[in-house]
């Protein structure tokens, strides 16, 4: 049986940063090749990097959110590219702006089918939401690490809310040991 932790895959890393000054997004959009800016649709300018692949959402306030990266290293590299592009437009950007990871979304596989009804009862209603008529997954809120896990009948998991990659490993450990205690992983 494969260790479920070995199946963990980072699907998305979201991080935020800022350059400490307001921006004229209309003028940035005209000068920054490949930028998308349609304030009627979305208040920020979208700038996509290809390698690594991600999207930076740049707001008038100077705040920047990077999403779509597959690792924390990729987030930092993508934002470095964005900072360099802004500097090329003569926009002052500190040498090393603080980058804060806000959310890491991972997937994993427990490698067996899950009886979500039994799990919902076993885990207790205070930590879970399970309404199969509304959504096929069971929502399990963990306190430590502070993440939300979606469990599916297929045995697949989605873990969201992590701040670092090891949060997913801790969550998978906690979920598997809790389900084993309840005799629900046989």
UniProtKB/Swiss-Prot annotation:
Entry-linked InterPro entries: TBP (IPR000814), TBP_archaea (IPR033711), TBP_dom_sf (IPR012295)
Keyword presence, Iron-sulfur: no
Keyword Repeat: yes
Sequence repeat copies, ranges: 10-86, 101-179
Annotated GO MF terms: DNA binding; DNA-binding transcription factor activity; general transcription initiation factor activity
UniProt keyword list: DNA-binding, Repeat, Transcription, Transcription regulation
Cited PANTHER family: TATA-BOX BINDING PROTEIN
Functional note: General factor that plays a role in the activation of archaeal genes transcribed by RNA polymerase. Binds specifically to the TATA box promoter element which lies close to the position of transcription initiation.
Family: Belongs to the TBP family.
Name used for this protein in its record: TATA-box-binding protein E
Organism field: Halobacterium salinarum (strain ATCC 700922 / JCM 11081 / NRC-1) (Halobacterium halobium)
């Amino acid at each position: 049986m494969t260790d479920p932790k070995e199946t963990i895959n980072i699907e998305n890393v979201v991080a935020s940063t800022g350059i400490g000054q307001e921006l004229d997004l209309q003028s940035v959009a005209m000068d920054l090749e490949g930028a998308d800016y349609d304030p009627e649709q979305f208040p920020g300018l979208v700038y996509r990097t290809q390698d690594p692949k991600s999207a930076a959402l740049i707001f008038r306030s100077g705040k920047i959110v990077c999403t779509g990266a597959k690792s924390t290293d990729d987030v930092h590299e993508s934002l470095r590219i964005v900072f360099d592009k802004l500097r090329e437009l003569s926009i002052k950007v500190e040498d090393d702006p603080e980058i804060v990871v806000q959310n890491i979304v991972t997937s994993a596989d427990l490698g067996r089918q899950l009886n979500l009804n039994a799990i919902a009862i076993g885990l207790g209603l205070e930590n879970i939401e399970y309404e199969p008529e509304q959504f096929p997954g069971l929502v399990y809120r963990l306190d430590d690490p502070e993440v939300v896990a979606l469990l599916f009948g297929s045995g697949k998991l989605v873990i969201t809310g992590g701040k670092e990659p090891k949060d997913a490993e801790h969550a998978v450990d906690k979920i598997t040991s809790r389900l084993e205690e309840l005799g629900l992983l046989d």
